């Protein structure tokens, strides 16, 4: 499967390029960067330190998409909306792990999925997506009258959105387990005199610092006991492997918007 990596010069872009080389059935056929990037014109393999691959980095995505089977996208919300539209024009797979999308961004990506096969997830790792299933089951079994749910996440100092896409993914799983809407039942900030905790609310706490790739814990706190479900990312390659797995799964599927739960057969 011929894959294009967008944001090829970034941390995740370089990880994707390296990881593609180790996965059977996947081949790098294109690499995209923003206009003005210092990586333009350079070989994608040389940029990532793995030697020449014969794929030059360009800022003109559509001709590259037209010759590919899929695109791997961990960029920004605005860029991901654009790439989803271009993937729809080219009728190819679009796998995006971009976080921080607004409701309007999500609607545009959903519209592009009428013509592109799109896999979108706040986290592409296999472990986190299994964790989301466990969180849903735990939230359903341990009701709001007895257990409060708090989600704690920590990432490196360079991360620009909060809570993380993974924290929100886990929050959505908890909300499904409780049969409530996360948007109406989440607490993102606590400061000053807040009063007692509201029954049934799902709280979020965000930490930023150092080089932490991603730590997430879902805490179900009851009277006299706590259940903690956690995931610790130790290498960005887990996200890259998941994204490539998603692309290979989506290749040949009908257009639509899918999640990693679909890819892993965990969607209930």
Curated annotation (Swiss-Prot):
Q: Provide the protein's localization.
A: Cytoplasm
Q: Which InterPro entries match?
A: DapB_C (IPR022663), DapB_N (IPR000846), DapB_N_CS (IPR022664), DHDPR_bac (IPR023940), NAD(P)-bd_dom_sf (IPR036291)
Its pathway is: Amino-acid biosynthesis; L-lysine biosynthesis via DAP pathway; (S)-tetrahydrodipicolinate from L-aspartate: step 4/4
From what superkingdom does this record's organism come? Bacteria
Residues reported in the UniProt entry to bind (S)-2,3,4,5-tetrahydrodipicolinate:
156, 165-166
Residues engaged in binding NAD(+): 7-12, 33, 97-99, 121-124
Q: Name one Pfam family in it.
A: DapB_N
Which UniProt key words apply to this protein?
Amino-acid biosynthesis, Cytoplasm, Diaminopimelate biosynthesis, Lysine biosynthesis, NAD, NADP, Oxidoreductase
Question: What CDD domains does the record tag this protein with?
Answer: DHDPR_N
Q: Which HAMAP family match?
A: DapB
Q: What does this protein do?
A: Catalyzes the conversion of 4-hydroxy-tetrahydrodipicolinate (HTPA) to tetrahydrodipicolinate.
What protein am I looking at?
4-hydroxy-tetrahydrodipicolinate reductase
Name the source organism: Brucella suis biovar 1 (strain 1330)
Give the lineage. Bacteria, Pseudomonadati, Pseudomonadota, Alphaproteobacteria, Hyphomicrobiales
Q: Which gene encodes it?
A: dapB
